[in-house]
A protein has these predicted regions:
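One-carbon transfer enzymes
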Residues: 1-185
Length: 185
């Protein structure tokens, strides 16, 4: 298992030709991406939604479509050249979205590994948007949100916080009500 602290040591020991960072949440040290061919999978239509919690940040903002992007890591957070990008739907449950990400990510990885000449696309950094990783306390559905936000917003907040993420909840006098499923009628 690789962690932020043991990554460099393990990479130096293995000395790989290519490194794929899929599901990785930390910045890669320059020593690594300068000396190895490093790719990252990011579930957004880069350069939009760079940074943490891209799936949640897109869903809560009402996005219906996204993409799976595989890019070469450089010194800019989620800012490297794009080697693969495929649009995916953000509709349905989180597990359905994950399946789409896996299928598109697998196809993209195989294309990168098996194609001699790939059309590389530079990112337009002027069009980039950046978001921070969501915190567990942001999973709360507040009374203010219930009163002021449309039902679709609340539904999206619940949907984007399905397992494995900290589920949506409402604070009660003695504890909290965790919400895992919803139905709009």
């Amino acid at each position: 298992h690789y962690t932020r602290s043991n990554l460099e040591k393990k990479i130096l020991k293995i000395n790989p030709d290519i490194i794929l960072f899929y599901g990785w949440s930390w910045k890669i040290k320059e020593k690594i991406f300068k000396n190895y061919k490093c790719f990252m999978l990011h579930p957004s239509l880069l350069p939009k939604y760079r940074g943490g919690s891209p799936i949640q940040n897109q869903i809560i903002r009402g996005e219906k479509m996204s993409a799976v992007t595989i890019f070469k890591i450089n010194e800019i957070m989620d800012g490297g050249d794009i080697y693969f990008q495929k649009k995916i739907s953000l509709m349905g449950s989180l597990s359905e979205i994950f399946k789409r990400i896996i299928v598109a990510g697998t196809k993209g990885t195989l294309k990168i590994l098996n194609t001699k000449k790939i059309k590389i696309k530079k990112q337009n950094h002027n069009r980039a948007t950046f978001f921070t990783r969501r915190k567990p306390e942001q999973s709360e559905i507040t009374i203010k949100e219930i009163k002021e936000k449309p039902a679709e917003y609340i539904a999206n907040k619940i949907r984007m916080l399905e397992n494995p993420y900290p589920n949506a909840f409402i604070k009660l006098n003695k504890g909290k009500l965790i919400i895992k499923k919803f139905k709009i009628k």
